Amino acid sequence: MRLKVLGSAEDALRAMTEQLIEKLMKLDQLLKNQEEFMGSFAHEMKTPLTSIIGYADLMRMEALSKEEQKEACGYIYSEGKRLQNLSLKLMKLLVLKNQQFQMKKQDLEPMIQEAVTSMQYRLKEQDILVNLNLKKAICKIEPDLLKSLILNLIDNALKSMNSGGILTVEDRATQEGAKIYISDTGCGMPKDEISKITEAFYRIDKSRSRKQGGVGLGLAICKEIVRIHQGEMRFISQQGKGT
Protein backbone atom coordinates (compact mmCIF):
# COMPACT_ATOMS: atom_id res chain seq x y z
CA MET A 1 0.00 0.00 0.00
CA ARG A 2 2.82 2.38 0.90
CA LEU A 3 4.56 1.66 -2.39
CA LYS A 4 1.36 2.45 -4.25
CA VAL A 5 1.08 5.84 -2.52
CA LEU A 6 4.73 6.61 -3.23
CA GLY A 7 4.21 5.65 -6.86
CA SER A 8 1.19 7.96 -7.17
CA ALA A 9 3.13 10.85 -5.59
CA GLU A 10 6.05 10.22 -7.94
CA ASP A 11 3.72 10.22 -10.96
CA ALA A 12 2.09 13.45 -9.80
CA LEU A 13 5.49 15.08 -9.25
CA ARG A 14 6.65 13.96 -12.69
CA ALA A 15 3.48 15.37 -14.29
CA MET A 16 3.93 18.68 -12.43
CA THR A 17 7.59 18.85 -13.52
CA GLU A 18 6.66 18.21 -17.16
CA GLN A 19 3.95 20.91 -17.02
CA LEU A 20 6.40 23.37 -15.45
CA ILE A 21 9.04 22.65 -18.11
CA GLU A 22 6.41 23.09 -20.85
CA LYS A 23 5.29 26.44 -19.38
CA LEU A 24 8.89 27.62 -19.03
CA MET A 25 9.56 26.71 -22.67
CA LYS A 26 6.44 28.63 -23.76
CA LEU A 27 7.52 31.63 -21.66
CA ASP A 28 11.02 31.46 -23.16
CA GLN A 29 9.53 31.39 -26.68
CA LEU A 30 7.21 34.29 -25.82
CA LEU A 31 10.15 36.38 -24.60
CA LYS A 32 12.12 35.52 -27.75
CA ASN A 33 9.13 36.51 -29.91
CA GLN A 34 8.78 39.81 -28.02
CA GLU A 35 12.51 40.45 -28.40
CA GLU A 36 12.32 39.77 -32.15
CA PHE A 37 9.22 41.99 -32.43
CA MET A 38 10.90 44.90 -30.63
CA GLY A 39 14.05 44.45 -32.75
CA SER A 40 12.00 44.54 -35.95
CA PHE A 41 10.00 47.53 -34.69
CA ALA A 42 13.17 49.46 -33.80
CA HIS A 43 14.58 48.73 -37.28
CA GLU A 44 11.36 49.84 -38.99
CA MET A 45 11.39 53.09 -36.99
CA LYS A 46 15.10 53.73 -37.59
CA THR A 47 14.98 53.66 -41.40
CA PRO A 48 12.43 56.48 -41.99
CA LEU A 49 13.73 58.51 -39.02
CA THR A 50 17.26 58.40 -40.45
CA SER A 51 15.96 59.71 -43.80
CA ILE A 52 13.87 62.45 -42.16
CA ILE A 53 16.73 63.65 -39.93
CA GLY A 54 19.24 63.44 -42.81
CA TYR A 55 17.16 65.53 -45.23
CA ALA A 56 16.12 68.00 -42.50
CA ASP A 57 19.78 68.46 -41.56
CA LEU A 58 20.69 68.96 -45.23
CA MET A 59 18.05 71.70 -45.55
CA ARG A 60 19.30 73.30 -42.33
CA MET A 61 22.99 73.29 -43.23
CA GLU A 62 23.07 73.71 -47.02
CA ALA A 63 21.90 76.47 -49.33
CA LEU A 64 19.65 74.38 -51.57
CA SER A 65 17.96 75.38 -54.80
CA LYS A 66 14.14 75.40 -54.90
CA GLU A 67 14.18 72.12 -56.80
CA GLU A 68 16.47 70.49 -54.22
CA GLN A 69 14.34 71.83 -51.37
CA LYS A 70 11.23 70.42 -53.02
CA GLU A 71 12.90 67.02 -53.42
CA ALA A 72 14.09 67.00 -49.78
CA CYS A 73 10.61 67.99 -48.55
CA GLY A 74 9.14 65.18 -50.67
CA TYR A 75 11.39 62.60 -48.99
CA ILE A 76 10.59 63.98 -45.52
CA TYR A 77 6.85 63.88 -46.28
CA SER A 78 6.85 60.33 -47.69
CA GLU A 79 8.95 58.95 -44.81
CA GLY A 80 6.76 60.83 -42.30
CA LYS A 81 3.65 59.23 -43.85
CA ARG A 82 5.34 55.85 -43.60
CA LEU A 83 5.97 56.43 -39.87
CA GLN A 84 2.33 57.47 -39.44
CA ASN A 85 1.16 54.35 -41.26
CA LEU A 86 3.42 52.18 -39.11
CA SER A 87 2.16 53.68 -35.83
CA LEU A 88 -1.52 53.42 -36.83
CA LYS A 89 -1.19 49.78 -37.92
CA LEU A 90 0.79 48.89 -34.81
CA MET A 91 -1.91 50.46 -32.61
CA LYS A 92 -4.57 48.47 -34.47
CA LEU A 93 -2.62 45.24 -33.97
CA LEU A 94 -2.29 45.89 -30.22
CA VAL A 95 -6.03 46.67 -29.93
CA LEU A 96 -6.91 43.44 -31.74
CA LYS A 97 -4.77 41.43 -29.33
CA ASN A 98 -6.32 42.95 -26.19
CA GLN A 99 -9.93 43.92 -26.91
CA GLN A 100 -13.17 41.93 -26.74
CA PHE A 101 -15.50 42.23 -29.73
CA GLN A 102 -19.25 41.70 -30.11
CA MET A 103 -20.23 39.37 -32.95
CA LYS A 104 -23.54 39.44 -34.81
CA LYS A 105 -25.07 37.43 -37.64
CA GLN A 106 -24.75 39.20 -40.95
CA ASP A 107 -24.69 38.50 -44.68
CA LEU A 108 -21.16 38.77 -46.08
CA GLU A 109 -22.18 39.55 -49.68
CA PRO A 110 -23.03 43.29 -49.33
CA MET A 111 -20.08 43.86 -46.99
CA ILE A 112 -17.55 42.33 -49.39
CA GLN A 113 -19.13 44.28 -52.26
CA GLU A 114 -18.75 47.51 -50.26
CA ALA A 115 -15.08 46.76 -49.48
CA VAL A 116 -14.28 46.10 -53.16
CA THR A 117 -16.15 49.26 -54.24
CA SER A 118 -14.12 51.36 -51.78
CA MET A 119 -10.94 50.15 -53.54
CA GLN A 120 -12.29 51.11 -56.98
CA TYR A 121 -9.92 54.06 -57.48
CA ARG A 122 -6.80 51.94 -56.95
CA LEU A 123 -8.20 49.10 -59.05
CA LYS A 124 -8.80 51.49 -61.98
CA GLU A 125 -5.45 53.19 -61.47
CA GLN A 126 -3.65 49.83 -61.76
CA ASP A 127 -5.97 48.67 -64.57
CA ILE A 128 -7.00 45.59 -62.57
CA LEU A 129 -9.90 43.45 -63.80
CA VAL A 130 -12.15 42.36 -60.91
CA ASN A 131 -14.14 39.12 -60.93
CA LEU A 132 -16.79 38.98 -58.18
CA ASN A 133 -18.63 35.75 -57.42
CA LEU A 134 -20.62 36.60 -54.30
CA LYS A 135 -23.55 34.70 -52.82
CA LYS A 136 -25.58 35.00 -49.64
CA ALA A 137 -23.44 33.74 -46.76
CA ILE A 138 -24.62 34.50 -43.23
CA CYS A 139 -22.31 34.03 -40.26
CA LYS A 140 -21.33 35.64 -36.94
CA ILE A 141 -18.91 38.49 -37.53
CA GLU A 142 -17.73 41.87 -36.29
CA PRO A 143 -18.56 43.98 -39.40
CA ASP A 144 -15.78 46.59 -39.16
CA LEU A 145 -13.13 43.94 -38.52
CA LEU A 146 -14.29 41.77 -41.41
CA LYS A 147 -14.25 44.74 -43.78
CA SER A 148 -10.72 45.53 -42.58
CA LEU A 149 -9.73 41.91 -43.30
CA ILE A 150 -11.04 42.11 -46.89
CA LEU A 151 -9.38 45.50 -47.50
CA ASN A 152 -6.02 44.30 -46.18
CA LEU A 153 -6.11 41.14 -48.31
CA ILE A 154 -7.07 43.09 -51.45
CA ASP A 155 -4.36 45.66 -50.68
CA ASN A 156 -1.84 42.83 -50.39
CA ALA A 157 -3.01 41.37 -53.71
CA LEU A 158 -2.72 44.75 -55.47
CA LYS A 159 0.84 45.19 -54.26
CA SER A 160 1.82 41.93 -55.95
CA MET A 161 0.18 42.70 -59.32
CA ASN A 162 1.26 44.71 -62.32
CA SER A 163 -1.08 46.65 -64.61
CA GLY A 164 -3.68 44.44 -66.30
CA GLY A 165 -3.81 41.84 -63.51
CA ILE A 166 -6.94 39.95 -62.43
CA LEU A 167 -8.38 39.98 -58.90
CA THR A 168 -11.04 37.41 -57.99
CA VAL A 169 -13.18 37.64 -54.85
CA GLU A 170 -15.62 34.86 -53.93
CA ASP A 171 -17.60 33.72 -50.92
CA ARG A 172 -19.36 30.48 -50.06
CA ALA A 173 -21.71 29.50 -47.23
CA THR A 174 -20.65 26.45 -45.18
CA GLN A 175 -22.15 24.53 -42.25
CA GLU A 176 -19.71 26.26 -39.87
CA GLY A 177 -20.16 29.76 -41.33
CA ALA A 178 -18.50 30.94 -44.54
CA LYS A 179 -15.40 30.77 -46.71
CA ILE A 180 -13.94 33.78 -48.50
CA TYR A 181 -11.51 33.37 -51.40
CA ILE A 182 -9.32 36.20 -52.70
CA SER A 183 -6.97 35.35 -55.57
CA ASP A 184 -4.66 37.41 -57.76
CA THR A 185 -2.49 36.98 -60.84
CA GLY A 186 0.49 38.63 -59.19
CA CYS A 187 4.10 37.61 -58.72
CA GLY A 188 3.34 34.83 -56.22
CA MET A 189 5.50 33.69 -53.30
CA PRO A 190 8.20 31.06 -52.75
CA LYS A 191 6.83 28.04 -50.82
CA ASP A 192 9.31 28.45 -47.97
CA GLU A 193 8.12 32.04 -47.36
CA ILE A 194 4.39 31.30 -47.01
CA SER A 195 4.56 30.20 -43.36
CA LYS A 196 6.25 33.50 -42.37
CA ILE A 197 4.10 36.11 -44.14
CA THR A 198 1.68 36.67 -41.24
CA GLU A 199 4.54 37.52 -38.85
CA ALA A 200 4.68 41.20 -37.87
CA PHE A 201 7.11 43.24 -40.03
CA TYR A 202 7.89 40.29 -42.33
CA ARG A 203 8.19 41.23 -46.01
CA ILE A 204 9.28 39.02 -48.90
CA ASP A 205 10.35 41.82 -51.26
CA LYS A 206 11.50 44.61 -48.93
CA SER A 207 12.45 47.10 -51.66
CA ARG A 208 9.12 46.71 -53.48
CA SER A 209 7.18 46.90 -50.21
CA ARG A 210 8.92 50.11 -49.08
CA LYS A 211 8.31 51.72 -52.47
CA GLN A 212 4.59 50.95 -52.10
CA GLY A 213 4.45 52.22 -48.50
CA GLY A 214 4.10 48.78 -46.90
CA VAL A 215 5.15 48.30 -43.27
CA GLY A 216 4.76 44.52 -42.98
CA LEU A 217 1.77 44.56 -40.60
CA GLY A 218 -1.21 44.06 -42.96
CA LEU A 219 -1.22 40.25 -42.89
CA ALA A 220 -0.40 40.18 -39.15
CA ILE A 221 -3.60 42.23 -38.65
CA CYS A 222 -5.50 39.80 -40.91
CA LYS A 223 -4.26 36.88 -38.81
CA GLU A 224 -5.57 38.51 -35.60
CA ILE A 225 -8.96 39.30 -37.18
CA VAL A 226 -9.33 35.69 -38.30
CA ARG A 227 -8.31 34.47 -34.81
CA ILE A 228 -10.97 36.71 -33.21
CA HIS A 229 -13.56 35.10 -35.52
CA GLN A 230 -12.26 31.61 -34.56
CA GLY A 231 -11.46 30.94 -38.19
CA GLU A 232 -8.37 30.01 -40.16
CA MET A 233 -6.47 31.63 -43.03
CA ARG A 234 -4.61 29.66 -45.69
CA PHE A 235 -2.36 30.80 -48.52
CA ILE A 236 -1.74 28.90 -51.74
CA SER A 237 0.79 30.54 -54.04
CA GLN A 238 2.88 29.87 -57.11
CA GLN A 239 5.71 32.14 -58.21
CA GLY A 240 4.96 33.93 -61.45
CA LYS A 241 1.27 32.91 -61.37
CA GLY A 242 -0.32 34.41 -58.26
CA THR A 243 -1.71 33.76 -54.79
Show the residue positions of the predicted features.
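Acidic ATP/Mg2+-coordinating residue in the GHKL
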Residues: 184
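Membrane-proximal HAMP signal-relay module
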Residues: 1-38, 53-60, 95, 200, ...
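Short conserved segments within the C-terminal catalytic ATPase subdomain
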Residues: 122-131
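Conserved micro-motifs of the catalytic ATP-binding
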Residues: 97-103, 134, 138-144
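Short acidic helix/loop segment immediately C-terminal to the autophosphorylated histidine
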Residues: 60-67
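Short conserved segment of the HATPase_c
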Residues: 189-203
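Short helix-loop "hinge" at the ATP-lid/N-box region of the Bergerat-fold HATPase_c
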Residues: 157-158
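Short alpha-helical segment of the dimerization/phosphotransfer core of two-component systems
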Residues: 78-83
